[in-house]
Structures are given as C-alpha cells and as structure tokens.
C-alpha cells in the first residue's frame, strides 16, 4: 500500500503514451525551427547580401510585413500566458502530498491539453519545454532589436523620410547625418549669442526702469522740497509781516507820544549849559518866563528869581535848576520862626564872594510868597499857567549862582537835627554817618537811585567851568532877561539864539578863568552838579561835576551826615546823578515817602553796602558785550536820523531789533565780544566782577519791591490829584536845569503834612499818610523785570544804558546780556 502511494501519477502511464510525448516534443522543435525562418533573421545581413538594386525593395517588403510580424508576436504572447497558467497549475499538482489516482491524473492531463492546445497531439508534449523555448525565442528577438539601430530607425521613419530615402543613396544620407553636430554647434552658438543679447537687453531695460524710478523719486523729492521751501517762505513772510505790524504799532505809539509832546512848549536846550545864568536865560526864553512886574532890572544888577525855600528840595531833586541865590540879609524877627530859620540858613550858606546890594526880606513879602506857594499846590499838574504878577521876591536880588548853595544848605539830607543849627555844609562830599537826619522843613522827599560815580579815580578835567568871575558878561545876559519881561516875546527864536550865543561866550570866559585859577573852586563846583539836560549825551558831564568838588577841596563831611554806605537819594546831586547812571533822563525813577509832620520825622534813606572795593582801589570797567557792540553804531544812526528821540524809545527799538536778529547775524558781535573780553582779561588778569546790591523799600513795616512801591505811589498820587482839584489858583512856574518848566508845587514847611503836587514830568508826589519807606540793600532779594528802572523794560535796554555809560562815564559798570538789570550802584 505504501509503495503505491509513494509513486507519482506519471509512473502509471503506459509506454505508448511516453513515446508519443517524446515524438510531440521533437515535432514541435522542428516546427518551431521551420515555421518562421525569415522573421528571426537579422535585416542587415539580408540587406547587405543582396545587391543595391534589390536592397530597397526588400527593405520595403520587410517593412510591409510588420503587421504580420506583430500578429505572430501577439499570438506568442497569448500562448506564453496560457503556458504560465498551466505551469502554475502543474506545479500545484506536483507539490501535493496526497497520492493521485490514475484516472484523476489522466483527466487532468486531458483538461490541460484541451485548454492549452485544443488538439490531441499537443497533449502529449511537455509544457515546461514549450515555455522555455518561447522565452528563449523572445530573448533572442529582443537582443537582435537592440543591436540593430538601423532597423529601429527604419521603423521610426515617416513616409516623407521613406520617399527621401528612395531618392537618395545611402552615402548621401550618411554624409548628411555626419554633418549634423557642426550645424548643431553653429545653432548652439547662435542661440547662445541670442541669449546673450536678450540678457543684455533685459539688463538695459532694467537699468532704464531703475533710472526712471530714480528720476521719478528725485522729481518727487524736489517737489516736496519746493513745497517745504514755499511753506517756509510763507511762514517767514508771515513772521516778517507780523514784525512789520509790530514795528508799525511801535512807530504809531512813538508818533502819538511825539504828537502829545508836540502840544507842550518847544524844548530849546543850550549847547553849552556850563553857566547857570545863560541856562536860566534860555529856559526862561523858551518857556515864556514872566518875571514879576514889580521888580526892575538894571544892566549891572542880578536878576531876581523867586525864593525857593528848603522845602523845595524834592522838587529841585526832580530836575529843578540849581540856581544859586545871592546872599540876602534877613532882618525880620517878627515873622514865622520857621521861615526865619530858613532865611538864616539861606544867608549863612551863600557864597562869600557874592556880595552887593539886594532887596531885604520883609514880613509882607514872605507872607505873599507863602500864599503863592500854597496856591500853586492846588493847581493840577497839567494846567497851563496864565501870566500873573508874582509878589516881589523877598529873597532879595537873586543871582543864578546862589540858588545851588541854597538848595545845598536847605536840602533835607543835609539838615542837622536841630532846626536852628545853621552852619555851612559841604554837600558835594559823600555823607559818612548812618544816623537818620531829621528835617522839619521837608514834608516830601524824592528817593532816586544813587549815582554810580565816586570821587575815586576821577580824572581832573581842567575844562570844568567855575562861576568865580560871575560878573563877567553879566550885563549882556541880563539885558536879554530884562527883554523877556514882555509877553510878546513868547516863542521868539531870535532871543533864544542870542541867549545861546551869550552862553557860549560866557562858557569861554569861565574856561579861561578856570585855567587861570584852577584851585579856587572851593564851594563853587557843587553848583555845577545838577545841570541836567534831557539829552542823555550831555548828562555824563554832570556826573563828572558832582564829585569833583570833594576831590579838589579834600574837605571831610560834617558831623551829623550819613555814612559812606548809606546814599541819600533826596539830594538833588544824587538824584540827577542817577540819570547819568542809566544814560537817560527817562530812566530817572523817583521814589517818595511821606513823614507824619513835625520836627521828629526821620528822612527816608537807601541803605546799601559798598561793592567791597577799597576807596583807593581803581574802578575797572567791564568789557562791552555783543549787544553793546552792535548798539554802539545803531544808536548813533538813530540819533542822527531823530535827534530829539528819547533814549528810552531808542533803547526799546534797539532791544526789539536785537531780539529779532538771528544767531547768524549776531555772530560777528559775539566774536567782537570775545575779543574784547580776551583783551580785558589780559589787561586785568585778577579782575572780578562785584555786582551791585539789590534794593527793597520798607513801607509800614512791609518789604516791598521797587515796582510794587511805585504802584503804591501812583495810587496815592492819583488820590492827591483828586483831593486837590478844588480851588485852583495860578501857580508859579519853576525853571529846571533841563530847560523844562514844571508847573509843580512849591511848598513851605509847616507842622502839618503839606502834600506837594507836581507835573507828570517830574513824577513827584506826596501823600498825607504817615508812611516812612526805607530803601535798603538786600543781596538775597532778586528783582524781576517789572521792578527795575523802567516799567516796561525789554531785553537789551539795560545793555544799551550800560553802553552809554561805557562811552562817556568813567565810573560806570557795564551789564551783560544774561545779567539782571541793576539800576542802583554802590560807591
């Protein structure tokens, strides 16, 4: 049983079947080798073995038989697929482990043969051999196809190429094929050239595009810049128009001021005001000064001027002409004791060289003068005065060289505590003691910034006039004055010009006298101290005159005077010297106080410390700053164009111009400032600027700044104007050193408060309130711009004033641009 199971199913076949299978295999081999002999042969041996005439037709016929060849290949592929199926089935049956029955094996072989060949003869062959044979044939065909390139080319040729090949021979075809690489290289070179040209063209286009972009961007930038420039120009034009409008407004204001001043009497200023007689003559000529008709004038006599008592110190300090009263003789003990004391002091303080007959005081004349002065108080400041007879002057024959001594002798500052004390005082020297001096004769005082100048290092000018030879040329000037008694000479220009010419002549005479007698000026130089003019250029000379007296005489101060650290601002010398300090009469700011009345009221004082410089140490000037350098020429130009323009207005114009200038325009002046500073540093290596002390005013125990104090004074002045507007009477004109007639008040000293009314020009006022302001120096107090010398000060104005001092005043300091203005100076 086991042997039967182990045998294969093919072992059971008979010998006949085995023989048939072998025969079938051999026949298939023969058929396979004989069926398609031509199809398996290569084409080129056939083509080359034949002659050229038969070569092309054979090739064409072979190509035409491709369809048959394709059908054969497709049939072979179908057979191969069927054989693969049979092989897989056969391998499956062979791998089976179970024995097969003979009938089953025969049945399977029949199925296989029927599926594969469909004929009984092919059932006997070996399917494996058939499959191997077909695979080998296919591989041989593929190998021959790859080796024969020409046959592949022939298959791929189109009909056009076939026709061309029919017309051409093989050599021409081969030659054309051989020339192809050269043509390809040529074409490649042409293509590369075209590519290069295209690349360059593209680069050019890109460059042109970039240039266009840049050009457009530059045009846009230019347009933007032009728009910005146009906008800036418009803004600049707008600013310039605004500045022009502001300047036009300022010009209109100046024109209004000029028009307002035009309604006032014309200001005729003597060119050489060194002699008080000609000064008084010119001032009287321009103002139509009417002398009392009761007083006669003779060519050789002194012309009388109204008696100015000691109570007029404030009015005199505000610009009253320092006329000197001739020595008079008081012989009326029955009059008011206060008036008698005034007359006694007046007589004792007159110059010893002035003697001669004059009118004597009588009680009636003194009372008339006192009544006239009280009447003048009640007249409003701006009221125009009619020409009324003046009572005969009880002061006697008054000469213009005596009133200065009267003012010196009766000034509130220089009075001794005792009312009856009468001794000659040298008022041109600085006071020494700090004790307040009581003055029962002065209800009003004027406080001014003190003069910057000091007697130290003052040059000894030999050209300073002296009124020693007072009688020289007096007759001609008195003739002019006597001719002015008529009201018909108002505004007579010829008379004024004659007075000016006489002033020049007398100036020359006084200069000759000064050269002949240079040391005989004791007690006379103080009369020159207060010769103030409204023109700021001439006020520097007055500053030099103030301190020349103590320098030449060498006299010390009397007992009872103030110390050197305290400056009395009620003295006319100090008041007018303060004008020269600022370089402008408009800068003269006046401060007032009101005593309670009686003989125990103390004077108001300005207490200041010295700069820390010894009296023997020379004063070193400060170098000019950029503004002062620039304004030096500008101020002269303005003065040439407008000689009558006030210094304050010029300073405002210059300050406005300086502020409107650009830094580039200011640059050369800053360079000049640096150069001057360098020279100054080389000249004075140890120089150290010592600023002035600040000032405050104490009123009713309160510390006020100068601006607040001035505002308070204005309000009180307005109250007093309203209080004294009733019962106006004609007032007595007062001729000042500046040639301006102040219709202000002349008050006699009384035990009750006697307020004084003055004009707006002098700014002198009074108040019955018992307030006692004291101006003292405070270093810690910083002053603002509103409390300085001017109410409406602008930047650069103080620098201009400092420049004025620099030009003419040897004792002045020079402020810089970044420095706060300091209108007060110490000794």
UniProtKB/Swiss-Prot annotation:
It comes from the Eukaryota. There is a cross-link at residues 404, 417 (Glycyl lysine isopeptide (Lys-Gly) (interchain with G-Cter in SUMO)). Residues 795-808 have a biased composition (Acidic residues). Keywords: Activator, Coiled coil, Cytoplasm, Developmental protein, Differentiation, DNA-binding, Isopeptide bond, Nucleus, Phosphoprotein, Repressor, Transcription, Transcription regulation, Ubl conjugation. InterPro entries: HMG_box_dom, HMG_box_dom_sf, SOX/SOX-like_TF. Sumoylation inhibits the transcriptional activity. The modification Phosphothreonine is found at residues 119, 401. Residues 184-257 form a coiled coil. One of its GO terms (biological process) is positive regulation of mesenchymal stem cell differentiation. It holds the Pfam family HMG_box. Residues 620-688 bind DNA. Homodimer. Interacts with DAZAP2. May interact with CENPK. This is Transcription factor SOX-6. It comes from Rattus norvegicus (Rat). The lineage of its organism: Eukaryota, Metazoa, Chordata, Craniata, Vertebrata. The gene is Sox6.
């Amino acid at each position: 049983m086991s042997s039967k199971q182990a045998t294969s199913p093919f072992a059971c076949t008979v010998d006949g079947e085995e023989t048939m299978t072998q025969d079938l295999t051999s026949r298939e081999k023969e058929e396979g080798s004989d069926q398609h002999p031509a199809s398996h042969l290569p084409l080129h041996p056939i083509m080359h073995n034949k002659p050229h005439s038969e070569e092309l037709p054979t090739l064409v016929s072979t190509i035409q038989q491709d369809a048959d060849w394709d059908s054969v290949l497709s049939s072979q592929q179908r057979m191969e697929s069927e054989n693969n199926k049979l092989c897989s089935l056969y391998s499956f049956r062979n791998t089976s482990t179970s024995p097969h029955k003979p009938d089953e094996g025969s049945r399977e072989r029949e199925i296989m043969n029927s599926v594969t060949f469909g004929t009984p003869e092919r059932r006997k062959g070996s399917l494996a051999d058939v499959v191997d044979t077909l695979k080998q044939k296919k591989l041989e065909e593929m190998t021959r196809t790859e080796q024969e390139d020409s046959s592949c080319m022939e298959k791929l040729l189109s009909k056009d190429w076939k026709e061309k090949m029919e017309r051409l021979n093989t050599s021409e075809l081969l030659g054309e094929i051989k020339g192809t690489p050269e043509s390809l290289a040529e074409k490649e070179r042409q293509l590369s050239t075209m590519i290069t040209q295209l690349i360059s063209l593209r680069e050019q286009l890109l460059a042109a595009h970039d240039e266009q972009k840049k050009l457009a961007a530059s045009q846009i930038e230019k347009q933007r810049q032009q728009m910005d420039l146009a906008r800036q120009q418009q803004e600049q034009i707008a600013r310039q128009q605004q500045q022009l409008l502001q300047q036009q407004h300022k010009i209109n204001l100046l024109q209004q001021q000029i028009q307002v001043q035009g309604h006032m009497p014309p200001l005729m200023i003597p060119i050489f005001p060194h002699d008080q007689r000609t000064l008084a003559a010119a001032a009287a000529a321009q103002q139509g000064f009417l002398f009392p008709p009761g007083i006669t004038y003779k060519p050789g006599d002194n012309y009388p001027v109204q008696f100015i008592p000691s109570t007029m110190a404030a009015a005199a300090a505000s610009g009253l002409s320092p006329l000197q009263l001739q020595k008079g003789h008081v012989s009326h003990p029955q009059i008011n004791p206060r008036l008698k004391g005034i007359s006694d002091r007046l007589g004792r303080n007159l110059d010893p060289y002035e003697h001669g007959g004059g009118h004597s005081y009588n009680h009636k004349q003194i009372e008339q003068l006192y009544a006239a002065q009280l009447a003048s108080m009640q007249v409003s400041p701006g009221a125009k005065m009619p020409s009324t007879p003046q009572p005969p002057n009880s002061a006697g024959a008054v000469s213009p060289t005596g009133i200065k001594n009267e003012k010196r002798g009766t000034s509130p500052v220089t009075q001794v505590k005792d009312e009856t004390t009468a001794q000659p005082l040298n008022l041109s020297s600085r006071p020494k003691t700090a004790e307040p001096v009581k003055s029962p004769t002065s209800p009003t005082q004027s406080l001014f910034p003190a003069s910057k100048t000091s007697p130290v290092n003052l040059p000894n000018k030999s050209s300073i006039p002296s009124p020693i030879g007072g009688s020289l040329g007096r007759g001609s000037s008195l003739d002019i004055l006597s001719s002015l008694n008529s009201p018909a000479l108002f505004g007579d220009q010829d008379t004024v010009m004659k007075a000016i010419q006489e002033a020049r002549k007398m100036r020359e005479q006084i200069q000759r006298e000064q050269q002949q007698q240079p040391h005989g000026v004791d007690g006379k130089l103080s009369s020159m101290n207060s010769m103030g003019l409204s023109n700021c250029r001439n006020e520097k000379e007055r500053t030099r005159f103030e301190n020349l007296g103590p320098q030449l005489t060498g006299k010390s101060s009397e007992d009872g005077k103030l110390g050197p650290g305290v400056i009395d601002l009620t003295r006319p010398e100090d008041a007018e010297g303060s004008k020269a300090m600022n370089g402008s009469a408009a800068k003269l700011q006046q401060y007032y106080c009101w005593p309670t009345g009686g003989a125990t009221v103390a004077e108001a004082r300005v207490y200041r410390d010295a700069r820390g410089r010894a009296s023997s140490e020379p004063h070193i000037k400060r170098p000019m700053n950029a503004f002062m350098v620039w304004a030096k020429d500008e101020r002269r130009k303005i003065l040439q164009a407008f000689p009558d323009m006030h210094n304050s207005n010029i300073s405002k114009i210059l300050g406005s111009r300086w502020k409107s200038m650009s830094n580039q325009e200011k640059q050369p002046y800053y360079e000049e400032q640096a150069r001057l500073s360098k020279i100054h540093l080389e000249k004075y290596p140890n120089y150290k600027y010592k600023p002035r002390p600040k000032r405050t005013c104490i009123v009713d125990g309160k510390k006020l700044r100068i601006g607040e104090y001035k505002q308070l004074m204005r309000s009180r002045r307005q109250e007093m104007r309203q209080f004294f507007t009733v019962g106006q009477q004609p007032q007595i004109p007062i001729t000042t050193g500046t040639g301006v007639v102040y219709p202000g008040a002349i008050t006699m000293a009384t035990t009750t408060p006697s307020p004084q009314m003055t004009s707006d020009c002098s700014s002198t006022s009074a108040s019955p309130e018992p307030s006692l302001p004291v101006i003292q120096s405070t270093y810690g107090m910083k002053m603002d711009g509103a409390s300085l010398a001017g109410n409406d000060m602008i930047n650069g104005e103080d620098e201009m004033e400092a420049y004025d001092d620099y030009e003419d005043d040897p004792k002045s300091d020079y402020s810089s641009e970044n420095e706060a203005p300091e209108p007060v100076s110490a000794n």
